[in-house]
């Protein structure tokens, strides 16, 4: 299927990241996950497969076309009972989830980079103590290391990485899997 995506297939998480997410879910005994950014559902499906039978995953995305692709994959893998999709801008969905007093063991962020800081701060409020916030694309093809590179998204990710590094609410590490994952543990 990925070959049919053309240039946008680069938005897909790497297989190594899927394996890592599954490992983290299993060793942490996580049961409730929020994903910000569904795309075609690879990461959501990978995480759902690692959840126990009573686990659940909510995934947020505003794109109904890619959401249809994702939900078709969820059904084929018999995971549709564990996965709930919400189709609207992620910040709107996050605010609703907060008002409903939802809490999560893990939040995985892989969505529009302009809102990474907003997603991070809002999601952190819904993570249980010692819960994990995992963010994708933090190495941004290695471009964040080039201080001379001031391309819009490179700068956004570089500034986001600095913000997270200085955040006293979490303990964090960057792993060079795929396009880079930041793993934050809520203190």
Model-identified regions with their sequence ranges:
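A short alpha-helical cap/connector motif
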Residues: 1-108, 113-134, 138-187
């Amino acid at each position: 299927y990925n070959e049919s995506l053309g240039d946008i297939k680069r938005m897909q998480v790497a297989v190594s990241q899927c394996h890592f997410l599954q490992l983290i879910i299993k060793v942490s005994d996580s049961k409730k996950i929020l994903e910000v950014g569904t795309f075609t559902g690879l990461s959501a499906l990978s995480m759902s497969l690692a959840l126990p039978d009573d686990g659940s995953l909510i995934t947020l995305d505003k794109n109904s076309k890619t959401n249809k692709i994702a939900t078709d994959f969820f059904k084929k893998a018999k995971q549709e009972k564990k996965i709930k999709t919400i189709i609207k801008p992620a910040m709107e969905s996050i605010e609703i989830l907060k008002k409903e007093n939802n809490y999560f063991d893990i939040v995985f962020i892989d969505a529009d980079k302009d809102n990474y800081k907003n997603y991070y701060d809002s999601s952190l409020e819904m993570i249980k103590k010692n819960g994990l916030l995992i963010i994708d694309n933090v190495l941004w093809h290695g471009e964040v290391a080039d201080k001379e590179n001031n391309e819009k998204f490179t700068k956004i990710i570089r500034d986001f990485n600095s913000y997270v590094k200085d955040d006293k609410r979490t303990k964090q590490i960057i792993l060079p899997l795929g396009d880079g994952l930041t793993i934050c543990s809520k203190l």
